[in-house]
Amino acid sequence: MQIQEIIKGKKGKLTIRLEEGLSFPIYEKEAAKYRMTEGGFLSDQDWNEICTEILEKRAKRRALYILQRMERTEYQLRKKLQENGYPEEIVQCAIDYVKSFHYVDDYRYACTYIRYHQ
């Protein structure tokens, strides 16, 4: 996978855009570990490691943080995670994770919403 662009963000955060159209957030230290440079290549092995060791864990923590303050629908949570720059497969993994603990339940959300807005 070729790295098309590296966009600097706040607090040492980068957004890496790949030629395939994927983009993902990563910190400068992690990018240096994988020797990411514009125009450089990212091996499939490195990509799989980044997904499992960095992005999945971070997206799960982010989902829990988002749900900590108020209940949300699956759609709302998906939208928030996508706004944070996570790829769709990572977003789905994080949603499946929080659903496994019943932290996201659209039926319960709808019942609660109706109960409080009658």
PLM region descriptions:
Residues 1-118:
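An alpha-helical, amphipathic repeat domain used for nucleic-acid recognition
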